[in-house]
A protein has these predicted regions:
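N-terminal signal peptide c-region/cleavage motif recognized by signal peptidases
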Residues: 30-32
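Surface-exposed, well-ordered secondary-structure segments
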Residues: 34-190
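Bacterial N-terminal signal peptides
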Residues: 17-27
Length: 193
C-alpha cells in the first residue's frame, strides 16, 4: 500500500508539471498571435516620441506620483520619481528613487496606442543594471515580458498589440546594486480605424 502511494505521489507530480508546461505553452501560443516584441524600426513616421527633456521644472527634481506627462501616468513603489540629467546623452529623464523599486507607466486609452517602447537602464558604461519589463493590454492582461541586463547604458524595449491596445508597462528593478533605473524616450504609435 505504501509503495503504491509513493508511486501515485510521484506520478501526480509529473502530471502537475506536465499540466503547467502545457498550460503555459497554450497561453503563450494564444498571446503570440496578437502581441509581440518589436524593434525601433517597426515604428513608422506617425510614431510620437516623448523625450522627457522639458517637464518645466529645474533639475534635479523629485516628483510625487502619480505624475501625468502627456498620455502617460507614472506611479512608483516609493511614491516619488527622480528627474535629472540621467537619460540618453545626459538628457533629462525619469527614474525610480529606490533600489529594487518599480515604475508603472499607464497609457491613456483615448490615445489608442498599439505600439509602445522606451529606453530602460542606467547612464554610463560602468552602471550595471537588471530590470524586468512587463507589457499589459488595456484590460490589464499580461501581453509579454522580458529582461534588460546591461553593464551600463540603455536598452530599447518595445511591444505591439495587433488585436488591441497597449495599456501599461511595468518596470521592476531586479539588481541589488544600490541604484535605481531610468526611463527615457517613450515611443508610441496608434492605428486608429
Amino acid at each position: 500500500m505504501q509503495r503504491s502511494m509513493k508511486r501515485l505521489a510521484r506520478n501526480a507530480r509529473r502530471i502537475s508539471i506536465s499540466a503547467i508546461y502545457t498550460g503555459a505553452a497554450v497561453m503563450l501560443c494564444a498571446h503570440s498571435a496578437k502581441a509581440e516584441f518589436i524593434t525601433l524600426s517597426d515604428f513608422d513616421n506617425t510614431a510620437v516620441v516623448t523625450d522627457l527633456n522639458s517637464l518645466g521644472v529645474p533639475t534635479p527634481h523629485i516628483f510625487a506620483t502619480p505624475l501625468k506627462v502627456g498620455i502617460y501616468m507614472f506611479t512608483t513603489d516609493s511614491g516619488q520619481l527622480g528627474y535629472g540629467a540621467s537619460g540618453l546623452n545626459n538628457s533629462n529623464a525619469l527614474s525610480t528613487t529606490t533600489d529594487l523599486g518599480w515604475m508603472r507607466i499607464d497609457i491613456a486609452p483615448s490615445a489608442q496606442v498599439t505600439k509602445f517602447g522606451l529606453l530602460v537602464g542606467l547612464p554610463g558604461p560602468q552602471q550595471h543594471n537588471h530590470e524586468a519589463v512587463l507589457f499589459f493590454d488595456d484590460y490589464n492582461h499580461l501581453l509579454g515580458g522580458t529582461g534588460v541586463s546591461r553593464r551600463g547604458g540603455f536598452q530599447f524595449v518595445a511591444f505591439e498589440n495587433t488585436e488591441g491596445l497597449i495599456g501599461s508597462v511595468l518596470i521592476q528593478d531586479a539588481d541589488l546594486n544600490s541604484s535605481s533605473f531610468v526611463v527615457d524616450n517613450l515611443v508610441s504609435q496608434s492605428h486608429r480605424p
